[in-house]
Structure formats: structure tokens, C-alpha cells
């Protein structure tokens, strides 16, 4: 029953126009939609985990030429690139390149690596839609 209600609310939320969800706009308030989708960037549908919901947000910085190492996320996550150029690669060689101002719905349960391909640090904010007690990232074992 709980999953059904969560699914209903997700459908309702995703079908509202952005301006319904926005603050009252005027000269001092500007709203810019970043992304709206039902799938991660590899085309897989977004599925929320069962359990007590927990949202986690973090700021990440990746030095020029550095990479995250191969890893995976068991829960949906959403990133916004604030600075630099980030390249995300899957094991099947699909690549997504992101610039400052672009958003990404990350892949779930799929190994991937992020790499700074620019000459300035990549800065991004990342939000996970997880559950209490669940790890957000698992590093690939060598």
C-alpha cells in the first residue's frame, strides 16, 4: 500500500508543470528548470527504493585529470555541475559529458566512472533519494 501511494504521488508530482511548483516569480525571483525525467541518462526507468526515505545532498570537487574510480549507486541520484567539465563513462563505453549548468540523473546499479576532462576543478552538487541505513555508493573491487 505504501509503495502504491508513493508511486501515485510521484506520478502526480511529475505531471505538474514547473511553474506550479515554482515560487512566485517577479523581478527579484527567477526560476530555471534544470531537468525533468522518468529515466536515468542510460535510459533506465527511475525506481525509488522501499523503506524510510532519506534524502542526502553533498558538494563534490574533482581536480583536473582526476577520476572517481569505478563505482555504482543502489539508489537514484541527481547532480548539477556548477563548474568544469565532467565525463561519465559506463563499462559498455557509453559516455555522457557535462558542462557547468547541466544536470544529470545518474545510473542506478550500473558501474560507472566520473572524470574531470577539463583544466579547472569540477564542482557539483549531488542529491540521493535513498533509505535510512543504506549505502549511497559502492566502489568496484579491483
Regions found by a protein language model. Give the residues of each.
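A short, N-terminal "cap"/entry segment at the start of jelly-roll beta-barrel domains
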Residues: 2-9, 13-56, 105, 139-142
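Membrane-topology and secretion signals of cell-surface/extracellular proteins
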Residues: 30-34, 50, 68, 88-89, ...
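N-terminal post-signal-peptidase region of extra-cytosolic proteins
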Residues: 43, 60-66, 74, 109-113
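A short beta-loop-beta micro-motif enriched in histidine and acidic residues
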Residues: 49-54, 66-78
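Soluble periplasmic/extracytoplasmic beta-strand elements of cell-envelope proteins
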Residues: 61, 87, 125-128
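Short acidic-glycine-tyrosine-enriched beta hairpin
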Residues: 62, 92-109
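Glycine- and acidic-residue-biased ligand/ion/polar-headgroup-sensing regions
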Residues: 73-92, 102
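Ligand-binding loop in jelly-roll beta-barrel domains
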Residues: 109-134
Amino acid at each position: 500500500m505504501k509503495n502504491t501511494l508513493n508511486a501515485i504521488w510521484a506520478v502526480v508530482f511529475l505531471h505538474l508543470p514547473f511553474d506550479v511548483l515554482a515560487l512566485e516569480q517577479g523581478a527579484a525571483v527567477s526560476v530555471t528548470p534544470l531537468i525533468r525525467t522518468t529515466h536515468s541518462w542510460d535510459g533506465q526507468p527511475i525506481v525509488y527504493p522501499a523503506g524510510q526515505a532519506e534524502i542526502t545532498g553533498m558538494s563534490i570537487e574533482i581536480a583536473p585529470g582526476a577520476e572517481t574510480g569505478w563505482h555504482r549507486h543502489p539508489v537514484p541520484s541527481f547532480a548539477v555541475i556548477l563548474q568544469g567539465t565532467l565525463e561519465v563513462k559506463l563499462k559498455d563505453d557509453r559516455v555522457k559529458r557535462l558542462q557547468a549548468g547541466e544536470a544529470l540523473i545518474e545510473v542506478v546499479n550500473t558501474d560507472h566512472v566520473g572524470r574531470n576532462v577539463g583544466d579547472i576543478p569540477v564542482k557539483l552538487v549531488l542529491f540521493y533519494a535513498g533509505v535510512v541505513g543504506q549505502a549511497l555508493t559502492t566502489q568496484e573491487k579491483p
